[in-house]
């Protein structure tokens, strides 16, 4: 598949990677199509940051990140822009990823970040074939931070107190005797267990395994008049949290249920006229805790001390931390139990009609297509049980371990809460429309195709006109218009030339800058088809092709960060603003006139980002197809990247926020290598596999940095979203070393032996915020690696797939102790006078550390290698009992996803985009079967 059509693989001169349904269906029980792409397409990087049911779709980038704004690729399903989440894996025939200028130029202002083409299955002429797929998945969490139990954490606190007594003699009151410590780990009875809690929050909240399941039925076939493919798919993602019975009339927790249906029909209306009709729909319901309290449910794994309180006491009272009552909200068990439930419902209906007419009677090889597509999507959030205003009315208790005194917190009022355990003190969440995800789309296009062969000369051409209209909620529609063409020439399958162009318009910009022309060219040379090479009779050489492409593509969109500049080219005015009272002496609230102020300064010169891409590559196959692969070297220059006014180098006396502008520039480069092998050892044995490596590095060249800013503080010459840190260079091992060191500009008096020595990078004689420097890598890996090995023996099939990344950094702030909670993590060895080569400094208790003493402690090497997929299956296809039962084949399989992980990270999350803590990432074990009738 290529943009707006198909080409023979041998004649393709663009950088295109492809995978098929067989590969996608063995990805270990995942229901997210995005997750199934991991490791299966060179150049494609997927990053998952949560295992929450329904939210496991990863962030996808192609050949790195070349913009600090959107890096999301364009996704087309059967030629229409649609979200990947709307497609079930069992309905996919193939996925193609277009990466270079030649492959993406026809998408104009939408193609700079790459394009993913998803083609769904279609019917073939013949009797009906029915496939039934069913699988059950057992899930468990992959990796969470290794937190100390109460005994170890409090023992560490004792050590810290000893180290800081000179600063805080009163901290001695927190020092615990060995007898007291023993009670946390070995309580004598229930009363002691509640007075000296030692809660393993992971064991308390999470099941050993959770269950998910998926079922799919599809039928395909056809006659000379009509071919059909129809599919129905149901997926359920279960909750890894334990089931909670709260006697309040609702069932809290997390889950995700999705139904997908699809019908693809191909009609041969006449010998020269075809009609293609695609109908698909999905209904998905995601269940979670209500509202903003959701993140507190999993914060236990990153922040709640094991000795703080019991999740729930024996009398049914929830635990809270009385010395600081605001921490009552951090009882994750309570947050899960009595915060209500909220349902997010997504409904989608997609339709597209394509009429194809062969015009061979006018000119051989000429045909025309007309397409009309209507999509509707609706999202409702908030429906369910709203208990968020009443959770604090539950009874709370805390037992002081020092005295054994019980403290309770009960909130009542005189209106209707006669009992603090009022089980009906919640209301029904009515739900509301999410306008950002509720939309309607209409696309229509006309396309003319030509392909013909004259002896050794093969020529092709394509011209396409498309209009798109897209509206969110009740907003004014977005509109685009595209005029696209492609011309191809192939001489004797030896020399190939291609030229693409797109003239695109977008109403996101002013009328003067609304249209632009993007184009690309590509050439190919099939060396193995040269007469001289054939004369050499190189039996080991099957195919060798060189190809190169160069061109420009655009990327429109006016969303920067969380702000949408829909009409960024226009001035925006609004009324109100009390600041005018200080200027005029008139209170606007008492004035008979409306006060207006300019809240946005427009920039009529706004335009799309422009990507200039170069790709030089080779494709090869040796030894009768046993070994094949490709190598690509690529470069990109991204210009005109949007910079919001708040980040521009504009003096404060400008008077208002500066307008958004196209001022950014980023360069990137890298390479891809893929090697595949496929060897039929005997009639029964086949060995196969593939390995791939992608390296992509980006560097900001221009970000409107202030000219007088120090070079290391500028964004220029750094990676996109570069990590920064104060750099440590060992420890203060004695007071003499500390007294002779560089002072800190804040809390300098709190430095002590055992602290990191922080590098005075700017050499100004003081550690300040200016010593925060670029360090490590960005959050996007520079290198991704994939290795897959498998074999087939008669009906048996087995494979394993490893996936890894490196040259990536991730910040995880796992702070131990700190004066309020006894949370402590296993980080290795702590500094002491007798252990001066420790892994990390000793934490603090009451003595506040100086501002910069963390150094690089919480900036982790984000590299990892994981056993991503593995499968063992057996297919029955020739057994007599199979035919007697009316079956064509039966495949039974066991597979898994995210099975093993090797990393220095404290948890299994590939990015922090979902927040500091998140629902645990899952490990899956899947058992299923596939029946073909």
What is each of the regions a protein language model found here?
Residues 131-192, 291-292, 562-570, 678-779:
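Conserved small-residue
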Residues 141-144, 193-233, 237-241, 252-330, ...:
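Flexible loop and strand-edge segments within Gram-negative outer membrane beta-barrel domains
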Residues 1-261, 275, 656, 685:
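Short, small/polar-rich motifs associated with maturation and membrane association
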Residues 169, 173, 191, 317, ...:
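Extracytoplasmic gating/loop element in the C-terminal half of outer-membrane beta-barrel translocons
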Residues 75, 761, 789-791:
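Short aromatic-centered micro-motifs
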Residues 364, 778-811:
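Glycine-rich, aromatic-lined ligand/substrate-binding cores of catalytic
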Residues 24-27, 72, 264, 268-269, ...:
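Extracellular/periplasmic, surface-exposed regions of secreted and cell-surface proteins
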């Amino acid at each position: 598949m290529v943009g707006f059509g198909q080409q023979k693989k041998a004649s393709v001169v663009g950088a295109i990677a492809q995978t098929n349904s067989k590969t996608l269906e063995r990805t270990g029980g995942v229901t997210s199509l995005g997750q199934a792409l991991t490791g299966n397409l060179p150049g494609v990087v997927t990053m998952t940051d949560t295992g929450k049911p329904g939210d496991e779709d990863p962030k996808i980038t192609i050949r790195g990140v070349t913009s600090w704004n959107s890096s999301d690729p364009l996704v087309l399903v059967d030629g229409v822009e649609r979200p990947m989440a709307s497609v079930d894996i069992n309905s996919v025939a193939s996925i193609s990823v277009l990466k270079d200028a030649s492959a993406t130029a026809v998408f104009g202002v939408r193609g700079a970040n790459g394009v993913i083409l998803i083609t769904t299955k279609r019917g073939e002429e013949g009797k009906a074939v029915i496939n039934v797929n069913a699988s059950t998945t057992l899930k468990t969490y992959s990796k969470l931070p290794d937190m100390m139990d109460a005994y170890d954490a409090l023992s560490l606190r004792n050590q810290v107190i000893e180290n800081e007594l000179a600063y805080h003699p009163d901290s001695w009151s927190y020092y615990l005797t060995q007898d007291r410590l023993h009670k946390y780990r070995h309580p004598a009875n229930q009363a002691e267990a509640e007075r000296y809690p030692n809660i393993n929050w992971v064991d308390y909240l999470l099941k050993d395994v959770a269950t998910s399941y998926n079922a799919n039925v599809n039928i395909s076939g056809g006659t000379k008049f009509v071919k059909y493919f129809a599919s129905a798919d149901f997926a359920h993602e279960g909750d890894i949290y334990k089931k909670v019975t709260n006697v309040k009339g609702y069932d809290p927790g997390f889950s995700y249920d999705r139904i997908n249906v699809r019908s693809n029909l191909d009609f041969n209306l006449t010998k020269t006229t075809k009609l293609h009709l695609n109908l698909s729909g999905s209904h998905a319901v995601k269940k979670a805790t209500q509202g903003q309290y959701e993140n507190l449910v999993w914060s236990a794994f990153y922040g709640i001390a094991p000795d703080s309180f019991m999740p729930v006491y024996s009398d049914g009272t929830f635990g809270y931390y009385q010395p600081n009552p605001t921490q009552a909200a951090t009882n994750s068990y309570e947050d899960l139990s009595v915060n209500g439930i909220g349902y997010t419902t997504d409904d989608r209906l997609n339709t597209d009609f394509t009429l194809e007419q062969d015009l061979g009677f006018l000119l051989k090889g000429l045909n025309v297509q007309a397409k009309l597509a209507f999509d509707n999507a609706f999202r409702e959030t908030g429906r369910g049980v709203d208990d968020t205003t009443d959770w604090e009315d539950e009874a709370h208790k805390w037992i002081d371990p020092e005295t054994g005194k019980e403290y309770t917190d009960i909130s009542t009022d005189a209106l209707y809460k006669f009992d603090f355990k009022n089980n009906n003190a919640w209301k029904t969440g009515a739900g509301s429309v999410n306008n950002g995800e509720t939309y309607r789309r209409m696309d229509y296009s006309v396309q003319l195709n030509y392909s013909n062969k004259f002896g050794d000369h093969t020529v092709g051409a394509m011209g396409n006109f498309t209009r798109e209209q897209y509206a969110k909620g009740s907003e004014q529609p977005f509109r685009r218009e595209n005029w696209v063409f492609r011309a191809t020439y192939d001489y004797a399958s030896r020399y190939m030339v291609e030229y693409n162009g797109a003239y695109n318009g977008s109403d996101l910009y002013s009328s003067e800058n609304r249209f632009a022309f993007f184009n690309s060219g590509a050439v190919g040379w099939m060396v193995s088809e040269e007469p001289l090479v054939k004369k050499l009779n190189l039996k080991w050489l099957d195919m060798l092709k060189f190809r190169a492409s160069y061109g420009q593509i655009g990327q429109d969109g006016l969303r920067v960060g969380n702000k949408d500049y829909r009409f960024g080219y226009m001035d925006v005015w609004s009324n109100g603003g009390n600041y005018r009272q200080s200027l005029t002496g008139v209170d606007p609230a008492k004035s008979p006139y409306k006060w207006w102020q300019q809240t946005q300064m427009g920039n009529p010169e706004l335009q799309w980002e422009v990507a200039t891409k170069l790709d030089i590559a080779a494709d090869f196959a040796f030894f009768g197809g046993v070994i094949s692969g490709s190598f690509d070297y690529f470069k990109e220059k991204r210009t005109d990247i949007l910079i919001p006014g708040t980040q521009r180098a504009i003096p404060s006396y400008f008077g208002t926020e500066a307008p958004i502008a196209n001022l950014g520039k980023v360069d990137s480069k890298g390479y891809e290598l893929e090697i595949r092998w496929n060897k039929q050892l005997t009639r029964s044995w086949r060995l196969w596999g593939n390995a791939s490596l992608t390296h992509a590095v980006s560097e900001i060249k221009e970000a409107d940095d202030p000219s007088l800013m120090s070079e290391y503080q500028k964004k220029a010459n750094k990676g996109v979203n570069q990590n920064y840190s104060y750099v440590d260079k060992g420890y203060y091992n004695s007071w003499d070393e500390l007294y002779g060191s560089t002072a800190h500009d804040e809390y300098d008096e709190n430095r002590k032996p055992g602290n990191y020595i922080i590098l005075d990078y700017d050499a100004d004689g003081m550690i300040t915020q200016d010593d925060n420097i670029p360090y490590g890598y960005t959050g996007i890996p520079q290198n991704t690696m994939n290795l897959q090995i498998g074999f087939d023996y008669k009906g048996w099939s087995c494979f394993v797939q490893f996936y890894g990344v490196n040259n990536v950094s991730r910040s995880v702030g796992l702070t131990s102790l700190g004066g309020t909670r006894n949370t402590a993590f296993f980080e290795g060895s702590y500094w002491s006078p007798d252990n001066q080569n420790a892994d990390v400094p000793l934490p603090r208790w009451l003595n506040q550390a100086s501002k910069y003493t963390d150094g690089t402690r919480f900036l982790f090497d984000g590299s990892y290698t994981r056993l991503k997929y593995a499968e063992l299956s057996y297919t029955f296809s020739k057994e007599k009992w199979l035919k007697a039962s009316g079956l064509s084949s039966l495949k039974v399989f066991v597979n898994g996803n995210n099975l093993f992980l090797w990393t220095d990270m404290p948890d299994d999350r590939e990015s922090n985009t979902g927040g500091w803590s998140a629902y645990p990432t899952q490990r899956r074990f899947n058992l299923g079967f596939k029946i073909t009738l």
